[in-house]
């Protein structure tokens, strides 16, 4: 990708929008809606850094060790994260949060979530 400043758009690429993705294990969806969409605006040459926009239908997943460092900004929807010690935090539209790599948590999307993300492997 070219090195230049760019705007992250909440609907993905203006020409193609967001595309189906499969980051979420199918068995974790909590309804018949298994929709998941993504658009990556930036990927470093080795893909150790990614930024984009992602959307998922409601799901609940126990994560033993979060696989990346990730900063997120919620565009719409809601997600509740529960740490290994039982502390829960709910994030909604406009909230910005960070999950360090290796974090044990429960990821519970209670209504369709759309977020901007920046990932560092």
List the model feature ranges, each with a label.
Residues 111-121:
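A short hydrophobic beta-strand segment most commonly corresponding to one strand
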Residues 40-43, 47-66, 100-101:
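Conserved short histidine dyad/triad with adjacent acidic residue
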Residues 1-48:
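A short, N-terminal "cap"/entry segment at the start of jelly-roll beta-barrel domains
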Residues 63, 81, 115-117:
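Short hydrophobic/aromatic-rich beta-strand segments that constitute the beta-sheet cores
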Residues 65-81:
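Short, conserved beta-strand element in jelly-roll/cupin
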Residues 85-101:
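Short acidic-glycine-tyrosine-enriched beta hairpin
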Residues 105-108:
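Short, exposed beta-strand-loop hairpins at the edges of beta-sheets
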Residues 84, 110:
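Conserved catalytic-core motifs of eukaryotic protein kinase domains, centered on the activation segment
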């Amino acid at each position: 990708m070219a090195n230049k400043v760019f705007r992250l758009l909440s609907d993905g690429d203006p020409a193609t929008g967001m595309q189906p993705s499969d980051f979420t294990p199918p068995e974790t969806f909590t309804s018949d809606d298994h929709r998941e969409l993504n658009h990556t605006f930036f990927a470093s040459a080795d893909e150790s850094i990614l930024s984009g926009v992602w959307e998922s239908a409601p799901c609940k997943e126990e994560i033993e060790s979060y696989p990346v460092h990730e900063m997120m900004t919620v565009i719409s929807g809601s997600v509740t994260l529960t740490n290994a010690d039982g502390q829960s935090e709910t994030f909604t539209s406009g909230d910005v949060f960070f999950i360090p790599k290796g974090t044990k948590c429960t990821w519970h999307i209670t209504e369709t979530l759309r977020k901007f993300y920046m990932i560092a492997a």
